[in-house]
Amino acid sequence: METRSKPQLLVFLTLFSVLFSQTLAWPLFGAPSALRMGDRIPFEGANEPDQVSLKADTDILQDALAENDTPYYDVSRNVRHADGVFTSDYSRLLGQLSAKKYLESLIGKRVSNSISEDQGPIKRHSDAVFTDNYTRLRKQMAVKKYLNSILNGKRSSEGESPDFLEELEK
């Protein structure tokens, strides 16, 4: 029975230590985020005279720093943090704006406002293809007509040759 109780005891001690450390880390009356540097809760033994002596100590320290003119920090930590947060958010905003402008320029190039402006290159291409196909068809028809005239016995003296050259030149 002792062999079974040792693991149970170990689990119980581990659980107890975790719960005990949690209660020490977090007060029972508030959330962990409630305790910040500015929102400190005084100890039960702290009273008004202790606060006055603490303020006097900080005043002495500030006077000593003012006399030496060598503060540890030129800019307070909060100001530097706020500047860093602003800079980071501002650069992220500029990146988003430039990406948005680039995307709008791509969309603007693809989709235009007027239909005739958008169909210009497509219409010119289709016109060129049609002209090319039509010219090829006319040349084939002229060759076919010329071959039929030769096979039927008509000669160039009858006036077929100039028409054939005109058909080929078109």
From Swiss-Prot:
The modification Isoleucine amide is found at residue 107. The keyword Lipid biosynthesis does not apply. GO terms for biological process: adenylate cyclase-activating G protein-coupled receptor signaling pathway; epinephrine secretion; mRNA stabilization; positive regulation of protein catabolic process; prolactin secretion; regulation of protein localization. Gene3D superfamilies: 6.10.250.590. Coiled coil: none annotated. SMART domains: GLUCA. Keywords: Amidation, Cleavage on pair of basic residues, Hormone, Phosphoprotein, Secreted, Signal. PROSITE patterns: GLUCAGON. The modification Phosphoserine is found at residue 76. It is found in: Secreted. X's at positions 28 to 44 were included by homology with the human precursor sequence. This is VIP peptides. It comes from Bos taurus. The gene is VIP.
